[in-house]
Swiss-Prot record:
This is Folate-like transporter DDB_G0272544. Keywords: Coiled coil, Folate-binding, Membrane, Transmembrane, Transmembrane helix, Transport. It is found in: Membrane. It comes from Dictyostelium discoideum. Belongs to the reduced folate carrier (RFC) transporter (TC 2.A.48) family. Residues 526-556 have a biased composition (Low complexity). Disulfide bonds: none annotated. GO terms for molecular function: folic acid binding; vitamin transmembrane transporter activity. GO terms for cellular component: plasma membrane. The keyword Manganese does not apply.
């Protein structure tokens, strides 16, 4: 018993533990079953949702991803198209502004000369040449050279091309500065003026070159822009020269800077295209073209105005420094004066390009007003007792001229159909001829006027020009008005005649209708009468036929009675 009890006591804990383990295992199995059931329920729910609702949250995410991808693709395509279109746009833009950059840059570099406002000072103070010799014996050769080479370059440009002439002119401009830097001999100074005139005559050929390289409709805009570039070059170089002079730098430095800009202009000219006339050069054709242009009254009118106005302007530009030197006996403000004159003039030079064809209706008024205003300003320059009055007069005068000059040049270019270079050069030659005559008249050969009195003379020339053109434009206006009135009267007469002829025609038509109507009535009456006569005749015939029938009947009765009687 004891052994069995021991065994039982020993077995009890094991059984207890086994029972506990069994209970635990049972609980764990139940938990696992519950978890499995929960998982199955969740899976069933998910499957139900996925089957019945097609997992919309996943579709929304997929749609958003697709939209984002599509947007990214569209953005990438837009960027690619933008960059692909950007390069052609840039190329086309540069092709459009390429002539503007080339021509305006060349004009700017050509005119960029800081030493220009101080040349008289350089001649007198640095080289030691007398002022009277400067403006009576040295400066006139610029005009002579300009005149001769205009004719030569105008003809050569059509043979060898305008580009070659422009390059020759820039080489001559560089040689001009080389002569100024190397010697003070008067003969060499005269040679320097000859090369300077040669370079400016080549610049005139450059203006004709612009006309050849562009459409006629674009020439006025480009001419105004090139003129503005020229003026900006003068303004900026004048300010630079003034600053350098105030820093007590020698004038030789200014000439060296001008030489450098001329070399840059020469390099730029080497890249120009070479335009020339396709037809062979013939002197007879050139002469015939020149005479043909003078058959056009409009061209003659513009030639006369430009000849006188340009000649006076060239003289004023050449001698204004001498005038200020006599007024103030110093040239410390010449840089500011020159820069101000051309700075404000550059804005006025652009105005005609903005107005376009609107300015054609008031051209005559503009030319007349310029003569009056410009002449008064030149007289005021000569009369001015101070540099301020003379400087203000010079600035306003220069603005007026630079405003009118592109208008005249464009009008001349529009009237010309061929040989633009020769005819442009001939226009300047007319101006230079007048300039030589004016300089000879005021010089020591004839009147021997001092510099102040010369400006009175120049102003009087513009006054006469203005009055002459006022009379001419007034005559043309009256002629046009008379012609318009005569045309209107003739139109009224024509209308009256047409009205009378229409009345006559209508009366004749009425008469014809009446005659036709009467004739129809007469014909109708005659037809009625004829019809009546015919009817009467028919009736008579019918009566005769009836009588004959009666007679025949009677005869038949008699014969029949005899038979019966028999």
């Amino acid at each position: 018993m004891e052994d069995s009890d021991k065994e039982n006591t020993l077995l009890l804990p094991n059984n207890k533990y086994r029972n506990q383990n069994f209970i635990r295992n049972q609980d764990e199995d139940e938990n696992e079953n519950e978890n499995n059931d929960n998982l199955e329920n969740d899976n069933n729910k998910r499957n139900y949702i996925s089957i019945n609702n097609y997992e919309p949250y996943k579709e929304i995410d997929n749609n958003n991803n697709k939209n984002n991808n599509n947007n990214n693709i569209i953005n990438n395509n837009n960027k690619i198209n933008f960059y692909n279109n950007l390069i052609p746009r840039i190329k086309s833009y540069f092709q459009e502004i390429k002539p503007f950059l080339k021509y305006c840059s060349f004009s700017f570099l050509f005119s960029f000369d800081p030493s220009e406002p101080y040349l008289v000072d350089y001649f007198t103070n640095v080289l030691g040449i007398n002022q009277t010799i400067v403006y009576q014996e040295i400066y006139p050769y610029w005009t002579y050279s300009y005149f001769v080479f205009l004719l030569i370059f105008g003809i050569l440009g059509e043979i060898i091309g305008y580009k070659v002439i422009i390059i020759i002119g820039m080489v001559a401009k560089i040689l001009t500065i080389g002569v100024l830097l190397s010697t003070n001999n008067i003969i060499w100074m005269i040679l320097e003026q000859i090369t300077e005139g040669l370079s400016y005559s080549a610049y005139t050929v450059f203006l004709a070159y612009i006309y050849f390289s562009l459409d006629t409709s674009e020439y006025q805009k480009m001419a105004c822009r090139v003129n503005a570039g020229y003026l900006v070059g003068i303004v900026s170089s004048g300010l630079l020269g003034q600053l350098l002079v105030e820093q007590r730098l020698p004038l030789v430095y200014l000439l060296s800077i001008a030489c450098g800009t001329n070399i840059l202009a020469l390099i730029l000219a080497l890249g120009f295209s070479n335009y020339k006339i396709d037809q062979k050069f013939s002197l007879k054709e050139v002469i015939s073209d020149l005479f043909g242009t003078f058959k056009n009254a409009d061209i003659v009118r513009w030639y006369i105005w430009s000849g006188i106005a340009i000649s006076i302007h060239q003289i004023v530009i050449t001698y204004w420094q001498n005038l200020f030197l006599q007024v103030n006996d110093e040239q410390s403000w010449n840089g500011y004066i020159s820069a101000s004159a051309y700075f404000f003039a550059s804005f006025f030079a652009i105005i005609p390009s903005k107005l376009g064809n609107k300015i054609n209706n008031i051209q005559g008024i503009i030319l007349v007003l310029f003569g009056l205003l410009g002449g008064g300003l030149l007289v005021l320059m000569g009369f001015g007792g101070s540099t301020v009055v003379s400087a203000l007069s010079f600035i306003i005068y220069n603005c007026c001229f630079e405003f009118v000059s592109p208008i005249v040049n464009v009008q001349i270019a529009k009237k010309l159909s061929s040989r633009i270079g020769v005819l442009f050069s001939f226009n300047i030659m007319v101006a230079l001829t007048i300039q030589v005559l004016v300089q000879s008249a005021v010089g020591k050969q004839f009147l021997n006027l001092d510099i102040k009195t010369q400006f009175y003379y120049y102003g009087a020339c513009l006054f006469f020009l203005s009055f002459g053109f006022a009379i001419l434009f007034g005559f043309l206006f009256l002629k046009k008005k008379i012609n318009s009135n005569s045309n209107s009267n003739s139109n009224v007469d024509v209308l009256i005649v047409n009205h009378n002829t229409q009345n006559q025609n209508s009366e004749e038509k009425k008469k014809k209708k009446e005659l036709y109507y009467n004739a129809n009535i007469i014909d109708f009456e005659n037809n009625n009468n004829n019809n009546n006569n015919n009817n009467n005749n028919n009736n008579n015939n019918n009566n005769n036929n009836n009588n004959n029938n009666n007679n025949n009947n009677n005869n038949n009765v008699g014969i029949g009675g005899n038979d019966n009687f028999k």
